[in-house]
Amino acid sequence: DQPRSRGLGDVYKRQVHGDEASEDDLEAMYGFYLQTFHEYGNSPALTLEFLRHLAATMPRALVIFLAQHEDRPVAGALCLRGGDTLYGRYWGADATLAGLHFETCYYQGIDYCLREGLTRFEPGAQGVHKIARGFLPSFVRSRHWIADPDFREALARWCREEDAAVHEHARVLAARSPFRATDAD
């Protein structure tokens, strides 16, 4: 018996690590991934072969959350586990059900972290809606080498401006936190 998803009637939740994922699980997750990219007009970078590779070479680091309805997967979230953290990366669905996104992407991840003793859950980029679920803004840094010197300088200027705007936006969002402030804050 699989546990039901909160408030989703006869939708059941399932969590599998890479070494537990069947070919059907990987194909379903890949289909959800493609669906999301097509929905937003983006080109997917990952392949089904890459998911198979992750499952084989990082069997306990790959974590997939699936929502099942009428004996078939209807949504999935692909996460990676490293150290004390679960990183949410991709989500997709071929059903539209109220609460399905939050259950699959956030609530199952939170449950997993609690069960596994992980101290952090990074649910992915974007989404002011995540604040209501207890996810506060955090800063992520990346480095890129730009070959063209003129473009590099223009991009560097833009990044400095964007950095200031992002920090201000994070300050405003943190003020809307569902958590009480403490003396340590």
For each feature predicted by the language model, list its residue ranges.
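A conserved beta-strand-loop-helix scaffold within acyl/acetyltransferase catalytic domains
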Residues: 10-98, 180-185
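Single conserved hydrophobic/aromatic residue that forms the stacking wall/gate
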Residues: 1-12
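In a subset of proteins, long, contiguous C-terminal domains/tails are tracked
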Residues: 146-147, 152-185
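Short, solvent-exposed polar/charged micro-motifs at secondary-structure junctions
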Residues: 23-28, 131-133, 150-151
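Short, flexible, glycine/charge-rich loop motifs used to bind or transfer phosphoryl groups or to couple energy/partner
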Residues: 1-2, 54-55, 111
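Acyl-donor binding region in acyl/amide transferases
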Residues: 83-149, 156
